[in-house]
């Protein structure tokens, strides 16, 4: 029989059971727990107690396993606990967790390791008189403090409530008393780590142990793990004996196989000679255990002389001797004598041990176990929560970060806000949350933050966000509307009225009617001129009954529209007369009415060609007050044509269906909109405008400095058939001048007209300016005369959108065309066409006024044509572009060239 016996609970051999349970044998129970770094996980190696090194056995360690060790004639029962703090047990647990995917992060895994170790440690505290905490290193692991503190809380809050009841009901463990344990167990701290102190230097080792004892005692006292009353402490610390031991014997960490091979080689290499005491000692060290290769009789009779040496086993025996003699009472003098200490027989103790093992180890490991005792149930449910300080720490910092993030999100919230603002506020709150949150609870708290922010936004804070025709979202709360006009973005623009005299605030439009008609009707009430000025009426839908609706159609003319756009023609030649470029160097145009027509064309020629009867455009410059620089003068040939026999066949507009959008070149014939998007008013006589000072501020407000001048356009008109009205015109003209000087035939047929034009742009802040060309803003100095020619705007496409020269980098839109007609027996005609490009030049719409003929303006008058604020095609409104620059302005939309023309008028003396 080996000097020391062992077995693994609960498999106790019969022969060992008889030995332990004979004569009511009493034993001091010493628990061995802590950490180990060897594959066998046996922490008794450093005690020099084992006869066979654990490395030579084939037993695999397992979490929660308890192994009993005792000597036949000894008084100590060693309980060796294998826990998750043993390195190889932890490695096996980690391998299983990775394989099964149960633990998704290290924090959860570490929490599981700590919880399982704490269960075993609490169980050891209940069944042991002494506990040796083994540490492989030379430094105390302060992470034990949190486990000790948590176990003290668990014991006081739960264990002392349910355990006495369970022991009493089972008639087992009555010897444990009210404390439900043998005693307040003494803790011995055993450090296996080698220090720099040599084993021979005992004084330094003792000094190190004393200093470590003081530090450990202070830490345990500061955390209230031990108190003056040991009965109220988790465990006790001896007051007059050592409780810290540093192992200086290197054999505790030796590898027996490697050491045996080294010793064998050393013995074989030794020179031949007689055997001595050193050889005997060498041979004994080669044996795997004491007595190996010797007879049982010699082993029993030959006992080694016990040497007085420094060992952990000697220290334990001192404490055991005190336990048998007086028991442990480590309380202060005030509480001394009140502690509970009992040494039961092994049989009695073992029955209680089995019950406590089931309560503290087996039942918590069984996930399906249920108990009727509420205190025990609370213990099972809350054990992990209390022990797991890491998860609690990370949960608390996540909660703290979550609270700060919630406050940050709620701070200065508007009454309603958009999804973009919501996401921005959430990102700010989430950024603040991530400054604090750590650990496995981050994702769960992130979802809580997301749900919280979403709930606030969706519960009465959600903004409607329905976009306006200018792209601004509705600022009202989420609401259901019957009409788009119920939306409001809260954005206010500044715009002028139809005549341009009055500026006012306008709301961001949500319908074409709001943008192109309603605003101008409202502001007209504030304007002193709009409602009294002469105006041109544009065709609109006039229902014949109350039963009318918007037309539903598929734009079959879309392909025709694309082809006609590039040839500057309209699809319907009968309703829109084409502007064609003929072989003649002069541009010719046609005037149509229901009874007669006259052809009219414009052209610029560089050479005089008698065969083609062409004339070169002359350059003249004159003004009533000052002389302008020489500029190109355009010559217009007016031909008086014959009366047309056939009248144009015009389709009558529908009186039951209206056009839902705006009129454009491809709109179905016979459909008209419900309201006009254009406006043409006569501001008054031409004398309103003086070229020396520009447009007066009281007539047109909001113009930028130097950009309030119209451009002069000098046009030379030649009569090809003077007999129609030239004779009477000259007669009246000579009479006015009181002269009878005859003129040549050529000079009597040519007239020079001065027409003042202005293409006005207006930004959303109300800034207005005239442009002198497709890419140039007019810059007229104070007191000087603008010398730019109007021909640039007449014969070029003018962009609809252009960067405003103001500081705010707004986009200005072409909103008005100013025309000051001359005092001459001709009429200026206008036929505006706006081409809006949608992405490419192959996808565009040409918007028209809907009139079947060009508009004839009266002589010697100031006319203003107001263009639409919003454009809408058959598929819906066309959003104004963003990022307009001088270089790309013409790619978004243009007012097409060829808008202006000249027609003859009846001659009367009042015109001169």
Curated annotation (Swiss-Prot):
Basic and acidic residues compositional bias, start-end: 604-614
Gene Ontology terms: biological process: nuclear-transcribed mRNA catabolic process, nonsense-mediated decay
Annotated stretches, region: Disordered: 565-630
Family the entry assigns: Belongs to the SMG8 family.
Superkingdom in the source lineage: Eukaryota
UniProt-listed InterPro entries: SMG8-like
A Pfam family annotated for this UniProt entry: Smg8_Smg9
Identification of the protein by name: Nonsense-mediated mRNA decay factor SMG8
Function according to Swiss-Prot or TrEMBL: Involved in nonsense-mediated decay (NMD) of mRNAs containing premature stop codons. Probable component of kinase complex containing SMG1 and recruited to stalled ribosomes.
Organism encoding this protein: Culex quinquefasciatus (Southern house mosquito)
Key words, A-Z: Nonsense-mediated mRNA decay
Keyword Zinc-finger: no
Residue ranges with Polar residues bias: 570-602
């Amino acid at each position: 029989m080996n000097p020391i016996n062992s077995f693994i609970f609960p498999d106790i051999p019969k022969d060992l059971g008889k030995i332990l349970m004979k004569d009511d044998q009493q034993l001091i129970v010493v628990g061995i727990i802590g950490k180990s770094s060897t594959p066998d996980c046996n922490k008794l190696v450093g005690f020099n107690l084992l006869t066979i090194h654990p490395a030579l056995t084939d037993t695999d360690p397992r979490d929660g396993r308890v192994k009993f060790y005792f000597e036949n004639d000894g008084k100590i029962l060693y309980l060796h606990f294998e826990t998750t703090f043993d390195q190889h047990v932890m490695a096996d647990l980690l391998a299983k967790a990775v394989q099964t995917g149960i633990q998704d992060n290290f924090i959860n895994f570490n929490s599981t390791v700590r919880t399982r170790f704490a269960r075993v440690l609490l169980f050891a505290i209940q069944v042991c008189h002494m506990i040796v905490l083994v540490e492989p290193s030379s430094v105390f692991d302060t992470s034990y403090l949190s486990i000790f503190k948590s176990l003290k809380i668990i014991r006081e809050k739960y264990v002392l409530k349910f355990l006495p009841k369970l022991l009493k009901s089972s008639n087992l463990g009555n010897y444990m008393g009210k404390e439900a344990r043998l005693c307040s167990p003494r803790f011995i701290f055993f450090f296996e780590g080698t220090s720099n102190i040599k084993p021979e230097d005992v004084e330094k080792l003792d000094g190190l142990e004393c200093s470590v004892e003081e530090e450990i005692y202070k830490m345990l006292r500061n955390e209230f793990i031990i108190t003056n009353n040991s009965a109220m402490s988790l465990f006790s610390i001896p007051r007059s004996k050592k409780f810290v031991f540093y192992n200086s014997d290197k054999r505790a960490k030796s590898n027996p196989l490697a050491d045996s091979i080294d010793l064998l080689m050393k013995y074989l290499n030794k020179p031949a000679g007689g055997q001595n005491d050193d050889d005997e000692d060498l041979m004994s060290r080669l044996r795997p255990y004491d007595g190996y290769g010797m007879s049982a009789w010699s082993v029993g009779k030959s006992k080694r002389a016990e040497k007085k040496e420094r060992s952990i086993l000697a220290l334990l025996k001192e404490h055991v001797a005190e336990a048998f003699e007086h028991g442990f009472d480590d309380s202060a003098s005030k509480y001394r004598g009140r502690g509970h200490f009992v040494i039961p027989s092994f049989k009695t103790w073992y029955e209680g041990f089995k019950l406590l093992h089931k309560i503290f180890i087996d039942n918590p490991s069984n996930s399906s176990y249920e108990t009727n005792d509420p205190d025990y149930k609370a213990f099972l449910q809350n054990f992990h929560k209390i022990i797991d300080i890491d998860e609690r720490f990370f949960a608390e910092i996540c909660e703290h970060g979550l609270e700060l993030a919630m406050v940050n999100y709620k701070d200065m919230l508007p009454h309603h806000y958009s999804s973009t603002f919501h996401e921005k506020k959430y990102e700010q709150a989430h950024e603040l949350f991530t400054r604090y949150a750590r650990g496995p609870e981050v994702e769960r708290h992130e979802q809580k933050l997301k749900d919280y922010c979403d709930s606030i936004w969706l519960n009465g804070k959600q903004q409607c966000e329905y976009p306006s025709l200018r792209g601004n979202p509705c600022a009202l709360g989420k609401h259901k509307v019957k009409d788009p006009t119920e939306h409001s973005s809260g954005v206010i623009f500044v715009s002028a009225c139809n005549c341009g005299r009055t500026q006012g605030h306008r709301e961001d439009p949500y319908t074409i009617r709001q943008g192109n008609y309603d605003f101008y009707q409202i502001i007209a009430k504030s304007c002193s001129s709009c409602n009294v000025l002469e105006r041109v009426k544009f065709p609109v839908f006039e229902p014949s009954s109350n039963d009318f609706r918007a037309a539903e159609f598929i734009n079959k003319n879309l392909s025709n529209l694309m082809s006609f756009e590039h040839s500057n023609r309209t699809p319907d030649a009968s309703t829109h007369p084409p502007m064609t470029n003929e072989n003649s160097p002069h541009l010719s145009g046609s005037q149509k009415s229901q009874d007669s027509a006259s052809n009219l064309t414009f052209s610029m020629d560089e050479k005089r060609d008698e065969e083609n009867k062409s004339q070169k455009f002359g350059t003249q410059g004159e003004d009533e007050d000052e002389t302008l620089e020489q500029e190109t003068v355009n010559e217009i040939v007016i031909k008086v044509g014959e009366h047309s026999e056939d009248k144009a066949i015009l389709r009558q507009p529908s009186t039951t269906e209206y056009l839902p959008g705006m009129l454009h070149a491809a709109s179905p014939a016979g459909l008209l909109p419900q309201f006009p998007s254009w406006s043409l008013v006569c501001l008054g006589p031409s004398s309103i405008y003086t070229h020396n000072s520009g447009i007066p501020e009281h007539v047109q407000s909001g113009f930028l400095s130097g950009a309030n001048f119209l451009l002069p356009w000098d046009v030379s008109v030649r009569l090809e058939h003077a007999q129609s009205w030239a004779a009477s015109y000259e007669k009246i003209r000579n009479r006015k001048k009181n002269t009878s000087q005859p003129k040549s035939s050529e000079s009597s047929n040519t007239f020079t007209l001065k027409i003042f034009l202005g293409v006005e742009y207006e930004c959303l802040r109300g800034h207005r300016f005239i442009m002198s060309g497709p890419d140039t803003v007019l810059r007229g100095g104070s007191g000087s005369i603008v010398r730019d020619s109007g021909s640039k705007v007449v014969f070029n496409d003018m962009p609809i959108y252009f960067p405003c020269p103001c500081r705010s980098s707004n986009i200005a839109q072409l909103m008005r065309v100013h025309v000051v007609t001359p005092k001459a027996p001709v009429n200026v005609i206008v036929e505006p066409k706006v081409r809006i490009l949608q992405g490419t030049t192959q996808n565009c719409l040409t918007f028209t006024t809907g009139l079947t003929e060009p508009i004839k303006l009266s002589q010697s008058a100031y006319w203003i044509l107001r263009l639409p604020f919003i454009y809408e095609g058959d598929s819906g409104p066309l959003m104004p572009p963003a990022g307009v620059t001088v270089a790309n302005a013409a790619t978004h939309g243009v007012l097409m060239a060829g808008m202006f023309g000249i027609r003859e008028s009846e001659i009367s003396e009042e015109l001169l």
